[in-house]
């Protein structure tokens, strides 16, 4: 038996080359201006006109179909039950490793989706705001595992998503500072009944152990209607992380308020060694143990090459 044929037969995804995916754009119009790309792009990530045209416009077209189908199903169920619920936002999860470009993808999707007709309200949050404060992580011995599932205030995040999905007004999310590397006290992002909410974070597709008593144990992805996993080989991710660390050493780390200010005067050799040590101790371990195993749970997988361009797209079969 041809093992490749068998693998393709049972693969839950349809896999597209970049060219095949780009052809699915159809007549979806470009609604972004060239000057917006630099504002949407994260440090050292790549975003240009061709990337938006080839990858994100087809994805925008697909998402418009998914959202429309979800709305029609919602109204059909409401009619069947004879009830009048509040509208339920469509929630999109964006997952992937540190330094893979999740934030760029999330911001591009927000910009494109907000320009659909008739101009839906599209909000974006990151799960960084639901990390425990550093004081709590220090007390629990988890500072070296910041970003691991156990470093998040999961009950608070689940309550937030439950309130959003229930259509409640003015749901608040904590604010996280990448400068101070900590939760900002008494600051909040307010989300007020969006049509679409994008939730970005490394572990948003994470599952928990199944309870033996059969009781329901919710996970973050239970609230998602669609999910995107941004993928890249580990060697590529490591290279991007080191490059980003070197850039931050020359910029943000010089701010006295920066949690990483102590790295600002490192030589290139010292900075590279430090970045690799952090990558291997924390980010690689998190990737291998927690993030990468969730990739098969995504609706769509964008696989990037070393130049930051998406090379293949995998869409889960219905």
From Swiss-Prot:
<dbReference type="Pfam" id="PF00485">
    <property type="entry name" value="PRK"/>
</dbReference>
<dbReference type="GO" id="GO:0005524">
    <property type="term" value="F:ATP binding"/>
</dbReference>
<protein>
    <recommendedName>
        <fullName>Pantothenate kinase</fullName>
        <ecNumber>2.7.1.33</ecNumber>
    </recommendedName>
</protein>
<dbReference type="InterPro" id="IPR006083">
    <property type="entry name" value="PRK/URK"/>
</dbReference>
<keyword id="KW-0418">Kinase</keyword>
<comment type="pathway">
    <text>Cofactor biosynthesis; coenzyme A biosynthesis; CoA from (R)-pantothenate: step 1/5.</text>
</comment>
<keyword id="KW-0547">Nucleotide-binding</keyword>
<keyword id="KW-0173">Coenzyme A biosynthesis</keyword>
<keyword id="KW-0963">Cytoplasm</keyword>
<keyword id="KW-0067">ATP-binding</keyword>
<dbReference type="GO" id="GO:0005737">
    <property type="term" value="C:cytoplasm"/>
</dbReference>
<feature type="binding site">
    <location>
        <begin position="96"/>
        <end position="103"/>
    </location>
    <ligand>
        <name>ATP</name>
    </ligand>
</feature>
<dbReference type="GO" id="GO:0004594">
    <property type="term" value="F:pantothenate kinase activity"/>
</dbReference>
<comment type="similarity">
    <text>Belongs to the prokaryotic pantothenate kinase family.</text>
</comment>
<dbReference type="InterPro" id="IPR004566">
    <property type="entry name" value="PanK"/>
</dbReference>
<keyword id="KW-0808">Transferase</keyword>
<dbReference type="GO" id="GO:0015937">
    <property type="term" value="P:coenzyme A biosynthetic process"/>
</dbReference>
<dbReference type="InterPro" id="IPR027417">
    <property type="entry name" value="P-loop_NTPase"/>
</dbReference>
